[in-house]
Structure formats: C-alpha cells, structure tokens
C-alpha cells in the first residue's frame, strides 16, 4: 500500500533532467545509454549538454533520448556546462516551470539499482535538494555533484539560475579543481546559506570514492562506481573485483556495461577473479575513513561572525573550498595570503598577498594541509588572529 502511494507521489512530480556528457572522441558507450534509459522512467523531459564533440553514432544514440541537444566547447567541465546551459541555452520561464530538476553526468557507472527506487526512497525525505552521497569532514562539507536533485522551492525561486549567472565567468573557465570548489562546494554553500535543507541517498559516508569504491558500495550502499576508479593511478584490481562480484551476485546491473568500457578505453581484458568472502569482510572492516578537519563548522562560522575583514591563507584546493563554501558568511573578504614572495596576483578574481605584506592583527583562516599549516604557524600565530582547520602544536 505504502509503496503504491510513494510511486503515485513520485509519478505526479513534473521533473526535468539535465545531463552533461563528455567523451574525448564523442563515443557514447552502452553504460551511458543504460543510465539514460533509467532516467527516462523518472523525468518528463531530458536536456543533454555535450562538452566537446560527438561522433555520428554518438549523436544518433543521444537523439534517441532527447532532441534538446546542446553541444559546446569543452571548457569548465560540468560546472561550466550547467552555467552555459542556464545562461545561454534555456529560457528561465521554462526551467522554473518544473517541480524538480535533476542534474547528472556520465562520470559514473550505474546506478546498480533501479533509479525509480532511489527516487521513491528519497521521496520520504522532506528536503529541498539531495544527491547520492554527502561528505562530512566537519567543514567544507558537500554533496557530490555527479547526481543532484533540486526540489520545487529551489526551482521556483530560480536559485540555480541566479547561482550560475553570478558565477558564469569562473565556472566556464575553471580547471578541474576550481570546478570542484566553485561548482560542487560553491553551489552547496550557496543553497545552505539561504536555509535550504539537504539530504543524501547514502548516509554517514566518509570513505574515498575513488580508492575505496568497494567499501562505499558494500558497506554504505552507494549504487555507483566512479569511472576514474579504472584510471591507472587509482586502479586496484582486488578492490574493483569486490565491486564487480557484488554487482553480479546482488544486483541486476549488467556488469558487461563496465567491462566493455574498460576494454575499449584501456585496451585490456577485464577478468573477474573470485574473491573470498572472509577477505571481503576484513577489507571492509579495516577501511579507514577520510580524515576530518579538527575545527568544527560552528567554530568557523563563529569566527566569521565575530570578524568582519577576512584573509584566507592559501591559494590552492583547500583555500578555494573554504572561500566558495563560506563566502556568503564573510562580510569583507580581503584576499588570499601565501608565504612565497613570488606568487600569482589573483585567485578566483581576488587579490593574493604575501603574508609579510598584510597588516598585523589581521583575521586569517589558515586553509592549508596539516603539514603546511604547521610550517607557517609560528610565523603568524602571534602576529594575527588566526583560525586553523587543523589543531597545530607550537
């Protein structure tokens, strides 16, 4: 009875999907077609954005699922693609007419369970937006952006449009890591700063999505594998064999969708070696979560409330994440700070200063890795009002 009610509720929602696709040769693999076939069951209309080019067969395949096909230069990754779509391709009245918007891309295999079942389960969560996986590291938390669903309040209030318009230049010119900051963390920070609630299909998960896909799948129930897990710098046959064995024995997902991609791209034959169940249990038991920052988000936000003028120490990935996720709480961002006298002039459009050139008693968030933070601590901790993401002993 309850399942029938849930299905009815899900089916009554007017939902559009926005799919971002990239493949260097424009080839549309079978796993992509499977994903689109699954999504067809849950969306009323599908828009497809292609970064780069499509081969003829790829175009024919995508046209089976949508004639709303937008091909653009391959710049800015998926964040740039969505920004381009909202700013240049779609009428704002059309996009705000939907009850829900799903943005997703082709950077993963799966889902290995029914997409309809995922939407039915998440219909029980009274949240404004959700995704597959929420990563909680005390600060700079976020929902991974390869599959995001935005509900009515966000859609009708045109929040996505405003975000992508405001950050269009950064997103369309971003490197991969800048995209992770400006799109993934930035959009999450923007929405949560405005009071929108969020949820995720997988709860309490801090395992590395690239190096521990088996733990994410078997222990946490994450129904996808990121394509990058097959890259040579991340590839572990024993880890992936655990995933593949789980998929074969526990799901209806066709493992050949992954095998065929692997054989085409890497020109290697994928041969599953049976994994001993005790070894799997031990591997899952001993998996180490991603380390968390020592500072709490409450303490970070209190620091921002109590201090108007803020510098962020660093001009790398962590500093970018802090800026994009918490910029809405910063009254006056003075710029980024680095140790080197020879440095870039600007980062995300903001000034970059040598630490020796900023006034004494400046308010600084030290957004560096633990070792680098320890190296700079003695030089700044007695001169400035500082907040470190990690506990540092002086």
Locations of regions flagged by a protein language model:
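Hydrophobic, well-ordered beta-alpha structural blocks that scaffold small-molecule cofactor pockets
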Residues: 283-394
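ER/Golgi luminal nucleotide-sugar-dependent glycosyltransferases, focusing on the catalytic module
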Residues: 2-294
